[in-house]
């Protein structure tokens, strides 16, 4: 593994530990060059409560690796969280910079009613 990836995983591990101490559900994201994925995971980490990604049928037809697609995923995860009765989460950016697609997903989720 490259040093860059090792550093990202170290940051992610530290963040997840802090979120676990808070005892709230977390909005975890994963980013690849082609897709972006979002999951809401229960406070104890045992269940995935809601998911959304650019692989969903609604988004698969268009561009999937850009800021616009990430915004749509953010809106979709917020809607699915509301349907599951979740309004407040902790944002787990998985060690990625809060910039570009990560920021677009977070902003769209906030605009659609998810609090973090």
Swiss-Prot record:
CDD domains: Ribosomal_L18_L5e. SUPFAM superfamilies: Translational machinery components. GO terms for molecular function: 5S rRNA binding; structural constituent of ribosome. This is Large ribosomal subunit protein uL18. The keyword Ribosomal protein applies. Signal peptide: none annotated. The gene is rplR. GO terms for cellular component: cytosolic large ribosomal subunit. Belongs to the universal ribosomal protein uL18 family.
